[in-house]
């Protein structure tokens, strides 16, 4: 067994020794400042007939006073203002408005909006493990079965290090501005679009017939591998049979081919955090000294403004520095200093900060033992990827047969099959959707979720009693594709404090199970790892076979520099099917160069392989693996369509939190508008469903869930506004999912040097003992 693996006790699975720790940046109990348990008790008594109007109004006014003071105190916290500034500089106006108005300001609609704003950010920073900045730092830990439950220490500061990255879109804007300069234009890199290929005097496309080229154009395209246009022109004119008399002729031909979409002319920045380094390298290759000095100088100006932002030590300095960065950017590029305002995952501002928590941790046998009940879920995850592969084998085979009959050959161009098959993967009705639904139905039958009596809040199972049913329901000998050998569970540890964790007095809660993906393969996660290349080597050890990585277009959903894959091995292949930036020419395979045929000796079984010109081959499903994982990564969802799902526990591992499903109309909270009426309606709704006071609520019209404290005036108001907005968009039937908060605030054990405790979670990488068949 390799040094990077640790056995999961009592199972055939192995866990990577490296563990990612994700955490909040503000103490968990800080959300208590916005709670109003006294007012909640009075409101409940009022609804039950035990309190009168006068008592209710008095308690309400007291809750209002407490809320005003609490919101003011949060707004006065320099770290809070700094966090908000990093995420949304323009939004700081609302925080500053609270400070100007003071803790006892009258509560008009503008003041309430500001309270809502502060509370929304506060819950993100205190009880959600969003990995961003010092308000969501990450760190790396290790695990070994021979060690004590938990050892380590927090450092003297919250953050050990942080890095400020310019957003890729900002670098692209600068690169495009530089490229407009007449002195730079001849030195722009010129490259064949990655999905195209030149073979002799033939230009191959993925989805249309090849185009015959003149000899000079074929010679030109063969040299377009990222060399500057001026270099290509110089070389062709100097070539005896290049076909061009002057460099101007070459440049004119390059412009024409670029307009036709054949060539990409310009600085080519990958969708990765290395985009700044790549741009600098390309600028340094400009051979004209004045043009190079000017171009590099523009990048230096932008980076200097970024560095000033990174060095800002307080909210005022940060605000000024970010304004300076925005001014510099607009002066250099002539463009707005923000993109896609209001969108999630958009990288809206010019830069972002990633932080490493000042923390050293190691976990031992007691934690591993409590992870062992993941075994049934991991086995079912293997089945899911295998079943999806089987379903696509059938779908792909049918498409292949039709195309082979049309072409009169069993070997068909992948470029022609690609787009037909793509519709079954990411189209309106992907084949995988039915498999995922069946996956959850089988689990619901095993757990008897359709037969749970009313009033049951928890279901407990032993892994021993589940073993037979899981084996029967999820039979699979191996995962479906290469990457599917990995599953990435996010687990949260519940303990009363640091000392209890060290003694092994803990409960483990499964937050999410990312099936069929190695979630460490995310660019910004390597920021704090002491030896990131060791992670890459470990992945290559576990997946020695060559793999496909799709070269995605810039507008692909959630395709960002922070989340880009980075752990490719030397033998891995970059598969290009559309124009896209950042192609690695050493690994690139355009779909236009590949063919698909039945596996050798397997013409009737439906197993298709992709073949390269050099003889390499892969199962066809591997070409779509990145897209298939989109269907598996969040497939584990057992709440179904019923109104209530109890908490589900395997041995001592919580695998499903207690969950309630309802609709906007059924809550009755979208209608009331007066604050006190809303609060009473929320207390009535909470009692009718038996909800805990603190929950996470996901409204179908929103991307992310929101923490809601049902004793809090401001969080009840936020909830009602969410529901009212959803009703305005889509009516009464918008789904609302409510989940218990587990771990609770009191279960936060991760401490800083001052004893403040933070929510946290561990992201693990679990390896299947069996590799995917090849």
Language-model features, listed with the residues they occupy:
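Glycine- and acidic
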Residues: 206, 214-220, 234-237, 377-382
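Type-3 copper protein
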Residues: 1-158, 249-546, 732, 736-774
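Acidic, low-complexity/disordered tracts enriched in E/D and polar residues
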Residues: 115-223
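Short amphipathic beta-strand/extended segments with alternating polar/hydrophobic composition
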Residues: 204-216, 405-414, 617-626
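Basic, Lys/Arg-rich alpha-helical nucleic-acid-recognition elements, primarily the DNA-binding modules
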Residues: 203-210, 219-224, 246-257, 263, ...
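C-terminal structured domains
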Residues: 495-729, 735-744, 752, 756-771
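Short capping segments at the starts of secondary-structure elements
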Residues: 221-231, 235, 241-243
């Amino acid at each position: 067994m390799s040094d990077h693996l640790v056995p999961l006790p009592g199972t055939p699975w192995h866990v990577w020794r490296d563990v990612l720790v994700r955490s909040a940046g503000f103490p968990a109990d800080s959300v208590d400042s916005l709670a109003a348990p006294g007012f909640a008790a009075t409101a409940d008594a009022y609804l039950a007939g035990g309190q009168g109007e006068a008592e209710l109004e008095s308690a309400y006014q007291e809750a209002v006073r407490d809320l005003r003071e609490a919101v003011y105190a949060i707004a006065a916290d320099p770290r809070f203002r700094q966090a908000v500034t990093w995420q949304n500089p323009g939004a700081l106006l609302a925080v500053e408005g609270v400070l100007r108005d003071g803790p006892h300001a009258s509560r008009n609609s503008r003041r309430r909006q500001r309270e809502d704003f502060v509370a929304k950010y506060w819950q993100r920073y205190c009880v959600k493990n969003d990995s961003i900045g010092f308000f969501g730092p990450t760190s790396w830990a290790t695990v070994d079965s021979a060690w004590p439950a938990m050892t380590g220490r927090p450092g003297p500061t919250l953050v050990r290090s942080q890095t400020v990255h310019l957003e890729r879109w900002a670098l692209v804007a600068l690169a495009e501005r530089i490229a407009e300069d007449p002195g730079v234009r001849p030195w722009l890199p010129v490259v064949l679009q990655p999905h195209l290929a030149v073979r002799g005097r033939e230009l191959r496309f993925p989805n249309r017939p090849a185009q015959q080229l003149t000899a000079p154009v074929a010679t030109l395209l063969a040299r377009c591998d990222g060399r500057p246009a001026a270099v290509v022109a110089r070389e062709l004119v100097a070539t005896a049979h290049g076909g061009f008399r002057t460099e101007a002729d070459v440049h004119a031909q390059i412009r024409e081919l670029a307009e036709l979409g054949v060539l990409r002319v310009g600085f080519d920045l990958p969708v990765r955090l290395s985009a700044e380094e790549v741009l600098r390298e390309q600028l340094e290759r400009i051979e004209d000294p004045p043009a190079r000095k000017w171009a590099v100088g523009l990048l230096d100006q932008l980076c200097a403004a970024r560095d000033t932002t990174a060095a800002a030590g307080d909210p005022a300095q940060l605000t000024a520095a970010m304004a300076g960065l925005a001014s510099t950017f607009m002066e250099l590029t002539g463009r707005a200093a923000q993109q896609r305002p209001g969108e999630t995952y958009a990288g809206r501002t010019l830069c972002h900060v990633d932080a490493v928590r000042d923390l050293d941790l190691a976990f031992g046998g007691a934690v591993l033992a409590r992870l062992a009940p993941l075994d049934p879920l991991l086995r079912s995850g293997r089945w899911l990827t295998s079943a999806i592969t089987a379903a696509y084998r059938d779908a792909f085979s049918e498409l292949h047969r039709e195309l082979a009959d049309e072409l009169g050959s069993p070997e068909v161009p992948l470029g022609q099959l690609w787009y037909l098959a793509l519709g079954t993967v990411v189209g309106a009705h992907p084949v995988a959707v039915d498999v995922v639904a069946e996956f959850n139905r089988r689990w619901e039958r095993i757990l008897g979720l359709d037969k749970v009596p009313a009033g049951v809040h928890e279901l407990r199972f032993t892994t021993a009693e589940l073993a037979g049913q899981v084996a029967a329901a999820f039979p699979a000998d191996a995962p479906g594709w290469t990457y599917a050998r990995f599953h990435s569970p996010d687990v949260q540890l519940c303990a009363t404090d640091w000392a209890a964790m060290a003694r092994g007095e803990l409960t483990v809660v499964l937050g999410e199970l990312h099936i069929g993906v190695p979630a460490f393969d995310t660019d910004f996660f390597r920021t704090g790892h002491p030896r990131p290349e060791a992670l890459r080597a470990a992945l290559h050890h576990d997946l020695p076979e060559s793999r496909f990585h799709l070269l995605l277009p810039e507008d692909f959903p959630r395709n960002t520099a922070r989340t880009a894959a980075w752990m490719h091995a030397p033998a891995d292949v970059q598969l290009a099917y559309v124009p896209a930036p950042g192609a690695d020419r050493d690994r690139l395979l355009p779909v236009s160069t590949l063919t698909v045929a039945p596996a050798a000796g397997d013409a009737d079984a439906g197993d298709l392989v992709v073949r390269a010109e050099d003889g390499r081959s892969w199962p066809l499903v591997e070409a779509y693996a990145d897209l298939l994982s989109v269907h598996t990564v969040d497939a584990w969802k057992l709440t179904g369509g019923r109104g209530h799902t109890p908490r589900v526990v395997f041995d001592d591992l919580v695998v499903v939190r207690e969950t309630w499903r309802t609709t906007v109309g059924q809550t009755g909270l979208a209608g009331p508008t007066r604050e006190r009426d809303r609060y009473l309606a929320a207390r009535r709704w909470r009692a009718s469903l038996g909800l805990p006071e603190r929950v996470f609520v996901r409204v179908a019209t929103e991307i992310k869930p929101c923490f809601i404290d049902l004793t809090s005036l401001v969080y009840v108001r936020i909830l009602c506004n969410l529901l009212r907005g959803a009703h305005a968009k889509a009516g009464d039937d918008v789904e609302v999912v409510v989940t218990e908060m587990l771990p609770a605030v009191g279960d936060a054990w991760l401490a800083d040097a001052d004893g403040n405790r933070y929510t946290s979670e561990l992201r693990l990488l679990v390896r299947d003992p069996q590799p995917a068949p090849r």
